[in-house]
Curated annotation (Swiss-Prot):
Component of the dark-operative protochlorophyllide reductase (DPOR) that uses Mg-ATP and reduced ferredoxin to reduce ring D of protochlorophyllide (Pchlide) to form chlorophyllide a (Chlide). This reaction is light-independent. The L component serves as a unique electron donor to the NB-component of the complex, and binds Mg-ATP. Belongs to the NifH/BchL/ChlL family. Its EC number is 1.3.7.7. It comes from Prosthecochloris aestuarii (strain DSM 271 / SK 413). GO terms for biological process: light-independent bacteriochlorophyll biosynthetic process; photosynthesis, dark reaction. GO terms for molecular function: 4 iron, 4 sulfur cluster binding; ATP binding; metal ion binding; oxidoreductase activity, acting on iron-sulfur proteins as donors; oxidoreductase activity, acting on the CH-CH group of donors, iron-sulfur protein as acceptor. This is Light-independent protochlorophyllide reductase iron-sulfur ATP-binding protein.
Amino acid sequence: MSLILAVYGKGGIGKSTTTANISAALALQGAKVLQIGCDPKHDSTFPLTGTLQKTVIEALDEVDFHHEELEKEDIIETGFAGIDALEAGGPPAGSGCGGYVVGEAVKLLQELGLYDQYDVILFDVLGDVVCGGFSAPLNYADYAVIIATNDFDSIFAANRLCMAIQQKSVRYKVKLAGIVANRVDYVKGGGTNMLEQFSEKVGTKLLARVPYHELIRKSRFAGKTMFQMEDGPEKDECLKPYNEIAEFLLSENPSASVPVPIGDRDIFEIVGGWQ
């Protein structure tokens, strides 16, 4: 039985880079991993494979949506550390539903008998859109993980995601494993002060603190994970939080909870208190 994770966060804060590095850490700790990108940009798995791979929707379109004509190699590429990578893709701009696309990807994996062949499956989901469509991965997930930075917009998006997780938990098994603080800069960004206060208020925890580091940005543009970058103390500093997250997720009973979202005015109070 696979452990299924849904990773969310505000767009543009390094969510896919973080997800790919968590996948790499999980694989290097012995797990068989599948990462599913759920964004029309289909760049979630780029650090794992070094390519913008064909999406499930593109593959289905080539066979007039006859699922039975597709094989594993038509939709999955194997990347760093043996991680399997899949990009769901998305409908054309201005039409269709992202949730439908995610559903088609899961359906195809099940038809190919692949869905239960992994120790861990990670959905990397377009972050601050919590419509019914893009919240679809929460229907399948054991745990949700929120990626956030120490600023108002990111915390506002995280709170909206907590609302979605709370709603889904009524009918599904999903719980919030915690929040990953990304791009932590204690000089310019205040560290994690606001995120710590927000996490406490919604009833969750910070899983790890990923530093704001040029090396992480360079790895992304190179189509690599941090684990593939040149060895050195800076690399070790960057790898530490990813390994901590993987160890937590692979532990026997990872602690998780149903979050209790706060009001919008409460978020302003958190941010205002640190100005």
